[in-house]
């Protein structure tokens, strides 16, 4: 009887593509208007002066200048702002 037993199936073998999240421009770096500063899920970083928020919570520069990261308020939230160069 030269039979081979059937191989089992697996429920693994899938993975999603990486979303390339994180800080794209660090503190002290010069940026131009429209530059992406942070890609994030939710408000890990909050927008400060001259920083806009996209519909996917991406933070971007509204004007040219220098990136500044700081902690603000009683909750010590992380905030990103653009300082005029």
UniProtKB/Swiss-Prot annotation:
Q: Where is this region: Disordered?
A: 1-27
An example of a GO molecular function for this protein is:
structural constituent of ribosome
Pfam families named in the record: Ribosomal_L27
Q: What is the top-level taxon of the source organism?
A: Bacteria
Which Gene Ontology cellular component annotation is one that this UniProt entry carries? cytosolic large ribosomal subunit
Q: Which UniProt keywords apply?
A: Ribonucleoprotein, Ribosomal protein
Gene Ontology BP annotations: translation
State the InterPro entries in the record: Ribosomal_bL27 (IPR001684), Ribosomal_bL27_CS (IPR018261)
Q: Which PROSITE patterns match?
A: RIBOSOMAL_L27
Which protein family is it in? Belongs to the bacterial ribosomal protein bL27 family.
| HAMAP family (alphabetical) | Ribosomal_bL27 (MF_00539)
Name recorded for this polypeptide: Large ribosomal subunit protein bL27
Gene from which the chain derives: rpmA
């Amino acid at each position: 009887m030269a039979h081979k037993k059937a191989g089992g199936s697996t429920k693994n073998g899938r993975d999603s593509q990486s979303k390339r999240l994180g800080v794209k421009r660090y503190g002290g770096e010069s940026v131009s208007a429209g530059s992406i500063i942070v890609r994030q899920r939710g408000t890990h970083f909050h927008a400060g002066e001259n920083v806009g928020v996209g519909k996917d919570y991406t933070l971007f520069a509204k004007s040219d200048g220098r990136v500044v990261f700081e902690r603000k308020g009683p909750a010590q939230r992380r905030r990103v702002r653009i300082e005029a160069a």
